[in-house]
Amino acid sequence: MKSDFEIRTADIPYEIQALLREYPRGSWEAHPGFKDKTRHWLGAHQMFRRLGNVVRSETERYLDRSSDPDDFAGRLSHRGGILVGNLHGHHGWEDYSYFPELSAADPRVDAGLEILEKDHEELDVVLDAFTESANRAIKLIHLDDTQACDEVGRLHGVVTTIESFLPRHLSDEEELAVPIILHHRPRG
């Protein structure tokens, strides 16, 4: 399933990372410009990484027959809904509020922000595929075990795509945004 999506694997261009070289990741928390809002934003990214891993692991347990189908359906509905809803809300806020603020603070990163916005567009496609497959799997769990296993197998491919997408994308966002915040302090 991973090959069905256009997931970016290339690094953000070197020239866009100028502030990252001045403010490397290891120095962020000690910087006086590193505030709670930034810490919470990074915390949301950590939650997305963990949740993607949990949903993939639970999908594998179902496929291995080590998970009760009804329990799996309930967890998939709950955690899948949290993953999709929060990712959509989070990157929508970034595209319409956060990224314009970063661009205004330092237009040198506009090309990097465009890359991240394109990532968000592709992530929307992947999340829609996840939602469709998860909903179909939940219905089939109650109707036809063989078809449910086939659908959960497809779902596993989609959630694996999400899980492989998130580390690169979120790391690039962090390494583009946090140095701007530390350098320009657009939020005071």
Regions found by a protein language model. Name each.
Residues 1-188:
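Small-residue-biased structural context
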